[in-house]
Amino acid sequence: MGIQETDPLTQLSLPPGFRFYPTDEELMVQYLCRKAAGYDFSLQLIAEIDLYKFDPWVLPNKALFGEKEWYFFSPRDRKYPNGSRPNRVAGSGYWKATGTDKIISTEGQRVGIKKALVFYIGKAPKGTKTNWIMHEYRLIEPSRRNGSTKLDDWVLCRIYKKQSSAQKQVYDNGIANAREFSNNGTSSTTSSSSHFEDVLDSFHQEIDNRNFQFSNPNRISSLRPDLTEQKTGFHGLADTSNFDWASFAGNVEHNNSVPELGMSHVVPNLEYNCGYLKTEEEVESSHGFNNSGELAQKGYGVDSFGYSGQVGGFGFM
């Protein structure tokens, strides 16, 4: 008799209705900055893996939390021993940057960069494009160990599978039909609701029956329309002197102005100068999220870092 696998979600003991929808700023300041400074988290929602050792469709099973998108802390290796370009080879293919970088700021200070990448199967530059997307968050001036072969000790990655045009068309048609029927006024509330459910079931079934080029066992059946975000172009950032992320994270922890529900958080000012340097890759933030995290319950205590157990703008308790 084999050993029964433990569900990571069950181990977290999360309250009903828990959602994790952090903003770009929250991911950068409250998670990546603290991770780079060596702090632990009272609630582990982001797994630590070497993301570039796996194909993206394997990653959902390695995540600690998530249904439609998954978060990971991962190191980033150099492409060449003394170079500054990252190695993007992963699993059976490679990640390719696309579009424009987005600079993440807090309290008017630039703290990190968000990069969007698409996974291709095969060898560059003749790989086959898939619908798997990665948003990579990295610090502007990461802390690096002397002589390290890694470009970054930690970056934070959001992984998700983009909805195809065929899936989106089926979704839109189903919603339109359901709304049209609901607005006719010829049926009772009960029959309208029943028909709405039938329509939803039919187009979800149609989605499941379609054959896509890159199907995998972790395909998600719950689909939603693509979201868009404003893209910010920039020429680059200067290589400043090593910034003390440990001190910065310590200030964040020491600051007692941590918000309750719905209040904006306070982050100390970062006193350093940013210059400019030429970027080597073009990237696109094709799928942004601006809604904050949510918790369905209240009344939790304060953890060792001074963060309230109530739901706040940070998306964790």
Curated annotation (Swiss-Prot):
Gene3D superfamilies: NAC domain. Residues 14-162 form the NAC domain. This is NAC domain-containing protein 19. One of its GO terms (cellular component) is nucleus. Transcription factors that bind specifically to the 5'-CATGTG-3' motif. The NAC domain includes a DNA-binding domain and a dimerization domain. It is found in: Nucleus. One of its GO terms (molecular function) is DNA-binding transcription factor activity. It comes from Arabidopsis thaliana. Its main location: nucleus. Keywords: DNA-binding, Nucleus, Transcription, Transcription regulation.
